[in-house]
Amino acid sequence: MGRDDWWRNASWNEEIEAVFFNKLARARNKTWYLRNQARALASSCPEVALRLLDQYFTLGGDLEQAGAHFYRARAHVALRNVDAAVLAFEAVLAREDAVPNFRTWAFHELPVLIAIERMSARYDRAIQVLVKHKDWLTFPVQLYQWHGALALILHEQGQTLEAENEAKQALEAAKMTHSGFQHHPNLGLVGDTADEFGNRLRQIASKPRSGLRWWRK
């Protein structure tokens, strides 16, 4: 890590922490560095990310509080703190409503979490969030998660035909090999789909329709 990259460590230990806080003590915009270091650690070192974000909010945050709430949500997801993750995602959406210039991916990551965890009491809320933010869809991975979350929820609600259609659209997005951006062709592509989310989508997309009957002699 170079001298100018002290705020985006991908790992964490006592030595890295000492350097980080030494640099932070001399930095002017401390909240910016805390937020961005938490971003880098949200999945790999979620406990550290949460601690940094606590300091960020203690200092009053900044205009990009939506991002801070978002990284907090991702850290809780990594720790399997599902209820805390939902609350953090909701804080993101509330902040985005208040300050719409700063957007995150909470509008599809929250519904994905709700769908994966089969949080049936929150299905209507998940669909509301998806529909409200459909115009925000940009990257293949967003299309994959948006249609995929809707597919899983509709399937749980017994709307099998609609779920099948959404699942197929999600899987088509997973096949995309270009982001649509000339200078960033690989940005926002779908990675590995061999997880619970992807497996459930494939099951929904390929499930035989019970209404069809074939005549055999």
Region locations from a protein language model:
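TPR repeat positional signature
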Residues: 34, 69, 107-110, 147
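Residue at a conserved register position within TPR or TPR-like alpha-solenoid repeats
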Residues: 41, 76, 114-117, 154
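Alpha-helical scaffold segments of alpha-solenoid architecture
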Residues: 104-119, 164, 170, 174
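Short coil/turn linking the two alpha-helices of tandem helical-hairpin repeats
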Residues: 100, 115-120, 138, 158, ...
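Residue signature of alpha-solenoid helical repeat architecture, marking inter-repeat boundaries
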Residues: 28, 63, 101-106, 139-143
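Extended, charged alpha-helical interaction scaffolds
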Residues: 112-116, 124-149
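N-terminal alpha-helical interaction modules that lie
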Residues: 1-86, 91-97, 136, 160, ...
